[in-house]
């Protein structure tokens, strides 16, 4: 290592102080570490560094002469280049300009109005704004287009170009008119102050100074600083040239220079660079050109412009960093775009890719290859698709169709898909509801029959909210109300179902009892009905089921007429004798009596057929001329027996037996007296309710009104009532032939008082049952005779329930009140 010489004040050491290898390495390291700060941006410099350009201009002509001499000397004697370092070992002794004179009128501005705007500071000319907005510079654009070389050209009649490979340092200048060193340095400093368009890249750093149109004519110097090197290369001696600049350069001017001149200049420069390599290491400016004392932006005091303030320098540095970042992003985007491209043969068929989101037709960067003019054949793929499904469609942006046509077809296809799916869903829903219509509740079916509901339009949601307690065409109930009503309905239905089960059970049991009692009757007849034990069973059977039609006449005759037929043979008239009297003596039949008979038949509340009517009239004629004459109830007894199908002889016999035993005069008198007894059973029940106060009267409660009750019951119930009355009027006795001889001379009144049972209680209990349980639609028993013939005391609740159940209920209630007597 050679020790550095001490240098005087105001002087700069030459390159001879440092060896060539060390000098080259120092220049390279300095270039890599701080060149981006000193040359590119013009910041972080000391004031003394501004002297470099002044000294460089002073030695411009001398350097050119030395370069020519060195070239000639190397041509004749290549070995003489070794002494060049000793000849150039001298000190630059130019005095720097007076700093006080420069900064007299360049104080820092005190307001924002005096500060240059960003547009003034950061733009060289009007043409550079477009490049700055894109984050690029003239040199950057030139680098993007060429990628291998860097070119700098100035046009002013003569063109000089310095083209070097990437990684070299170059500084070129084209000179038009010779000027003094001092003036050229001054002009250069003035022009350097207009440096604004500066670009950074990863490989190079360039500073370009162009003459502003408003500058004076004398300041026509242009400096181009190219510092791309980070490879340790030295600067060529001819890299610093001062020329007179022609008009402003633009991006197009760089690319439109004379190719011949540029190639020739490039060849000359290459030869010169190769010959001057040893001299470069010993040149006085080789080490001082890129020293830390060299300013990138000289002071603007010479041309009357203010220097950059710290804030302006900060804004300049921030703008340069932003441009550098934009340039880096652009380079990376281009890299990834290149990497993302696919070969032309690897692209898929557009007809098979239709559901992938794509860009609009204006995006031409999607594909670089030329597409086919014809539309791809999709016939083969279309055969596999449904006509209503989404057909294949071209990728937007790569087919020769407009956006409107593409989206119209897509809209039609989507509409067709939606309409078809909607039609299929509707069809399936209607089919499902049609098949499930039979499973809907009865409320919907009844409403459909009435025209209030369409079963096809009943959905599951409607079925879930519709309640059976309200018609389906009305608004649905509230949730709580529906739950409460459904709970009550379930309770009522459960009770009704229980009652229905009980009714069915009772009906079944009644049928069993009916069969059992019929068999018991056969046994009782065989054993004898007038026995005391037999009569108890007979009464029980009468209250439970009644007598059968086949054995009813026999039971009546045996119980009421005794085993020897005493009443019918001794106290009743013979029908043959009565018929002879009518034919012999009463032809024609007396009109007064006949009118009375017709009235009895007409007042009956039963429809009477003509055949039954003639028989009934004949029976009534016999009864009218008989010993006891016509009595209350004869017409009803004879009519119901006729309905049973008995012959006239049997009917005559049974009707007279009932009138002489069950409804005789003693029974009628006791009925009238007991029913009006206020202390009796009927009186006590009627006094409990004040509504019966008016009805408790002899006009309404008598034997005549009793038959009004029997006239308002059905035939089956009437016969059942007669069975009970006959059974309750039966008497247990053993009739013998001796008793028969003793009764031969006994009249009817004596026989009645001695051997006939008088049971008025069964009749009074029947009237009480009607008054208390079936008092509906009439005011009193006398009013019953005035009601229409269709009125019945006991009738079925509905048509689905058999009336026999109501008859059974009537008999049970009657038995209940009969037990009170």
Curated annotation (Swiss-Prot):
Disulfide bonds: none annotated. Residues 20-36, 60-74 have a biased composition (Low complexity). The keyword Cytoplasm does not apply. GO terms for biological process: fungal-type cell wall organization; protein transport. Keywords: Cell wall biogenesis/degradation, Golgi apparatus, Protein transport, Transport. This is Protein SBE2. Residues 75-85, 125-136, 170-186, 264-291 have a biased composition (Polar residues). Its main location: Golgi. The keyword Disulfide bond does not apply. It comes from Kluyveromyces lactis (strain ATCC 8585 / CBS 2359 / DSM 70799 / NBRC 1267 / NRRL Y-1140 / WM37). GO terms for cellular component: Golgi apparatus. InterPro entries: Sbe2/Sbe22_C, SBE2/SBE22_M, SBE2/SBE22_N. Residues 1-151, 169-188, 264-311 are annotated as: Disordered. It is found in: Golgi apparatus. With SBE22, is involved in cell wall integrity and polarity processes like bud growth. Belongs to the SBE2 family.
């Amino acid at each position: 290592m050679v020790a550095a010489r001490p240098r005087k004040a105001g002087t700069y050491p030459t390159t001879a102080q440092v060896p060539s290898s060390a000098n080259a390495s120092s220049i390279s390291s300095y270039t890599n570490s701080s060149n981006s700060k000193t040359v590119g941006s013009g910041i972080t410099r000391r004031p003394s560094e501004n002297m470099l350009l002044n000294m460089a201009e002073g030695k411009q002509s001398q350097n050119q002469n030395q370069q020519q001499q060195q070239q000639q000397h190397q041509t004749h004697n290549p070995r003489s280049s070794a002494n060049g370092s000793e000849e150039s070992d001298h000190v630059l002794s130019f005095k720097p300009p007076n700093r006080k004179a420069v900064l007299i009128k360049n104080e820092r501005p005190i307001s924002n109005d005096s500060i240059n705007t960003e547009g003034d500071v950061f733009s060289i000319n009007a043409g550079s704004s477009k490049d700055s907005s894109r984050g690029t510079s003239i040199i950057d654009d030139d680098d993007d287009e060429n990628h291998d070389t860097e070119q700098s050209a100035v046009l002013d009649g003569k063109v000089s170009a310095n083209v070097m490979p990437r990684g070299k340092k170059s500084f070129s200048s084209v000179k038009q008119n010779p000027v003094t060193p001092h003036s050229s340095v001054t002009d250069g400093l003035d022009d350097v102050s207009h440096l604004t368009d500066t670009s950074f890249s990863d490989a190079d750093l360039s500073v370009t100074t162009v003459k502003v149109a408003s500058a004076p004519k004398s300041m026509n110097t242009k400096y181009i600083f190219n510092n791309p090197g980070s490879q340790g290369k030295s600067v060529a001696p001819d890299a610093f040239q001062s020329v007179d600049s022609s008009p402003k350069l633009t991006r197009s001017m760089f690319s439109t220079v004379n190719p011949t001149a540029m190639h020739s200049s490039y060849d000359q420069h290459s030869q010169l660079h190769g010959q001057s390599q040893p001299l470069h290491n010993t040149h006085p400016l080789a080490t001082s050109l890129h020293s830390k004392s060299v300013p990138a932006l000289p002071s603007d005091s010479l041309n009357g412009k203010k220097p950059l303030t710290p804030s302006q320098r900060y804004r300049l540095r921030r703008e340069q960093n932003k441009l550098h970042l934009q340039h880096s992003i652009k380079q990376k985007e281009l890299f990834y775009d290149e990497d993302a491209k696919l070969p032309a043969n690897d692209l898929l068929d557009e007809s098979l890719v239709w559901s992938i989101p794509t860009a609009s037709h204006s995006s031409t960067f999607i594909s670089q290859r030329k597409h086919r003019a014809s539309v791809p054949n999709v016939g083969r793929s279309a055969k596999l698709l449904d006509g209503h499904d989404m057909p294949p469609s071209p990728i937007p942006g790569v087919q020769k169709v407009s956006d409107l046509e593409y989206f119209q077809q897509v809209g039609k296809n989507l509409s067709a898909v939606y309409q078809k799916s909607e039609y299929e869903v509707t069809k399936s829903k209607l089919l499902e509801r049609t098949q499930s219509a039979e499973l809907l509740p009865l409320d919907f079916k009844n409403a459909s029959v009435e025209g209030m509901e369409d079963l096809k339009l009943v959905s599951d949601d409607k079925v879930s909210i519709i309640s059976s307690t309200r018609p389906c065409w009305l608004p649905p109930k509230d949730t709580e109300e529906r739950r409460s009503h459904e709970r009550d309905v379930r309770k009522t239905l459960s009770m009704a179902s229980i009652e229905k089960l009980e009714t069915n059970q009772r009906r079944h049991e009644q049928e069993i009892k009916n069969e059992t009692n019929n068999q018991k009757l056969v046994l009782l007849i065989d054993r004898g009905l007038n026995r005391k034990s037999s009569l108890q069973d007979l009464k029980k059977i009468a209250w439970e089921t009644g007598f059968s039609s086949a054995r009813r006449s026999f039971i009546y005759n045996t119980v009421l007429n005794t085993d020897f037929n005493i009443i019918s043979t001794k106290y009743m008239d013979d029908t043959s004798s009565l018929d002879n009297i009518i034919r012999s003596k009463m032809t024609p039949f007396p009109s007064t009596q006949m009118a009375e008979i017709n009235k009895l038949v007409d007042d009956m509340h039963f429809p009477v057929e003509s055949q039954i009517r003639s028989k009934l009239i004949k029976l009534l004629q016999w009864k009218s001329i008989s010993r006891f004459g016509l009595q209350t109830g004869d017409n009803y007894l004879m009519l119901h027996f006729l309905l049973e199908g008995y012959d006239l002889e049997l009917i005559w016999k049974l009707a007279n037996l009932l009138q002489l035993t069950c409804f005789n005069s003693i029974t009628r008198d006791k009925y009238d007296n007991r029913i009006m007894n206020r202390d009796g059973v009927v009186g006590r029940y009627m006094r409990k309710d004040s509504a019966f106060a008016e009805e408790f009267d002899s006009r309404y409660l008598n034997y005549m009104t009793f038959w009004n009750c029997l006239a308002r019951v059905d035939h089956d119930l009437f016969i059942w009532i007669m069975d009970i009355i006959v059974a309750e009027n039966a008497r247990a006795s053993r009739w013998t032939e001796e008793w028969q001889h003793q009764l031969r001379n006994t009249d009817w009144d004596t026989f009645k008082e001695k051997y006939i049972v008088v049971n008025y209680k069964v009749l009074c209990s029947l009237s009480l049952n009607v008054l208390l349980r079936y008092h509906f639609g009439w005011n009193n028993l006398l009013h019953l005779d005035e009601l229409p013939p269709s009125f019945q005391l006991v009738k079925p609740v509905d048509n689905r329930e058999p009336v026999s159940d109501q008859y059974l209920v009537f008999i049970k209630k009657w038995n209940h009140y009969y037990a009170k007597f």
